[in-house]
Amino acid sequence: MSRTIFCTFLQRDAEGQDFQLYPGELGKRIYNEISKEAWAQWQKKQTMLINEKKLNMMNPEHRKLLEEEMVNFLFEGKEVHIEGYTPPEQQ
């Protein structure tokens, strides 16, 4: 059975995660406050960031950068800036 949460990213009730996807306190916050839909949006941005900036997830500095971008996107409402990318709605 799915859980319904108030998603702080979408600002509405939505289906919550099935399990904690990220470790630690931040992971608990994501589990309790971020819906599946919002997480899917983040995953698309994350993939673009990793590819465009050529991030290596074995590098602790790259992981830290990605985590900062994730917090900014999911909790602070900041858009992820990817050089050279223009969203379709702005073209």
From Swiss-Prot:
Q: Which UniProt keywords apply?
A: Iron
Q: Name one GO cellular component term.
A: cytosol
Q: Name one GO molecular function term.
A: iron ion binding
- Please provide an example of a Pfam family that matches this protein in its UniProt record: Iron_traffic
From its record, what is one biological process in GO terms? cellular response to oxidative stress
| Top-rank taxon | Bacteria
Q: Any keyword Iron?
A: yes
Which InterPro entries does this UniProt record tie to the protein?
A: Fe_traffick_prot_YggX, Fe_traffick_prot_YggX_sf
Protein task: Could be a mediator in iron transactions between iron acquisition and iron-requiring processes, such as synthesis and/or repair of Fe-S clusters in biosynthetic enzymes.
Self-association state and partner proteins as the record states: Monomer.
State the family named in the UniProt similarity comment for this chain: Belongs to the Fe(2+)-trafficking protein family.
Give the protein's recorded name.
Probable Fe(2+)-trafficking protein
